[in-house]
């Protein structure tokens, strides 16, 4: 309700003042998992997506603020945290030093030993950094599940979508991660029926 909203948000905040938005969600009653958004917006212009026009370019929550919010969730009793973002693997491109997602995850796991499990939301195959790949092998707390924003398994359709990866890139990532940690399972976002997609294009996705 309007009254409930005003209880948490009583100050006008511009859309891009991401760091000033109060973190009101701190109670997932009777849950062991909580979600922590660390990134918003997107710098890319995929032909099927309106997010950049609705949420603006990518911007990231500073590591110190992520750590503070994470600690609050742990104090509240949560055992598993899912890091989320519109374009999660672009994290840090707008911050000083451009810290990569893998580096941030490594720091969070080091700073918060009480964290039992860490999970990632959907990530872009074109931006997975090498340190993140290595963490799947070295960090047991990083859960063995990865959801990729694949969209299509056909290179022509990917080009028309203005995606930055190819079919071969995705298969390489699958193979590389499985080589580091065989138990990792994968999920994917897939768009079916994209304009000009034929049965042959669709078979390449299957």
Please name every model-derived segment.
Residues 75-202:
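Conserved SAM/AdoMet-binding glycine-rich loop
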Residues 1-91, 131, 142, 146, ...:
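Proteins enriched for Cys/Gly/acidic motifs involved in redox and nucleic-acid/cofactor modification
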């Amino acid at each position: 309700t309007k009254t409930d909203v005003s209880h948490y948000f009583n100050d006008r905040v511009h859309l891009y003042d991401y760091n000033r938005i109060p973190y009101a969600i701190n109670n997932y009653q009777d849950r062991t998992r909580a979600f922590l958004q660390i990134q918003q917006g997107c710098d890319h212009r995929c032909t099927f997506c309106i997010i950049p026009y609705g949420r603006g370019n990518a911007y990231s929550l500073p590591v110190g603020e992520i750590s503070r919010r994470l600690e609050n969730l742990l104090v509240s009793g949560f055992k598993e945290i899912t890091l989320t973002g519109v374009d999660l693997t672009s994290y840090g491109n707008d911050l000083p030093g451009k810290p990569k997602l893998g580096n941030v995850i490594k720091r969070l796991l080091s700073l918060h030993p009480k964290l039992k499990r860490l999970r990632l939301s959907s990530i872009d195959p074109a931006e997975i950094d090498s340190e993140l790949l290595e963490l799947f092998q070295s960090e047991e707390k990083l859960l063995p599940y990865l959801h990729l924003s694949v969209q299509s398994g056909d290179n022509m359709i990917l080009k028309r979508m203005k995606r930055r990866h190819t079919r071969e890139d995705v298969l390489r990532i699958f193979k590389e991660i499985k080589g580091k940690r065989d138990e990792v399972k994968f999920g994917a976002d897939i768009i079916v029926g994209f304009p000009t997609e034929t049965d042959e294009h669709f078979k390449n996705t299957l």
